[in-house]
Regions:
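The feature marks proteins involved in alpha-glucan
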Residues: 1-32, 62-157, 164, 169
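Short loop/turn segments at connectors of secondary-structure elements within structured domains
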Residues: 39, 53, 77-79
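Short beta-strand elements bearing conserved aromatic residues within extracellular beta-rich modules
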Residues: 43-45, 81
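Short, surface-exposed loop motifs enriched in S/T, G, D/E and P with embedded aromatic residues
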Residues: 55-63
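Aromatic-lined carbohydrate-binding/catalytic grooves of carbohydrate-active enzymes
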Residues: 160, 172-178
């Protein structure tokens, strides 16, 4: 999808792949950052690649879309970053986490880190073909939301690790009809 089409659909509220447009996208030329900040007068990306200085890498608005963009050659996978957003009405500067970030530092930090492009080879062509024949608009919706840290714990109160949790949660969800 071309950027103009992606921006148009995003502003229409119909871009169901906005994660491909927004966030941080690393390639051989560096990392392209895009963020939607429609009320901003100025946006810049700050990170460990520029000493967290907001004057070094300003983003440019993409027309009237509310999306801001910059490509930073020095920004590489593993670097931490956030956005410095200046409110166009008040002039207030805020440091914001990337809502489309794909990796984040551990608490108490809240910066995103640049994730390298995926090299994962999907093997779900059969499932996608089966799904294409499914009329999802006529099917019931069944959503199960779980907070992993509180859903189930070891008898002493220690949270399960992700693998341990998966061993328990997946059979439980299947038994509930998910």
């Amino acid at each position: 999808m071309q950027h103009a089409d992606a921006l148009y659909l995003f502003n229409e509220g119909r871009n169901n792949q906005a994660y491909r447009l927004l966030g941080a996208h690393a390639d051989v030329s560096g990392t392209t950052f895009r963020v939607w900040a429609p009320n901003a007068g100025r946006v810049s990306v700050v990170g460990d690649f520029n000493g967290w200085h907001g004057d070094v890498h300003p983003l440019l608005p993409l027309g009237e879309s509310g999306v801001w963009e910059a490509t930073v050659a020095e920004a590489n996978p593993g670097n931490l970053y956030r956005f410095e957003v200046t409110n166009r009405h008040t002039g207030d500067k805020l440091i914001k986490s990337d809502p489309y970030g794909r990796g984040f530092e551990l608490r108490p930090g809240s910066a995103a880190y640049i994730v390298p492009p995926s090299t994962y080879a999907w093997g779900d062509a059969g499932w996608l073909q089966q799904r294409a024949g499914w009329d999802w608009q006529q099917a019931p919706v069944n959503i199960y939301e779980v907070h992993p840290g509180s859903w189930m714990r070891h008898p002493g109160g220690k949270p399960y690790l992700w693998g341990e949790l998966a061993e328990r949660l997946i059979p439980y969800a299947l038994a509930q009809g998910y």
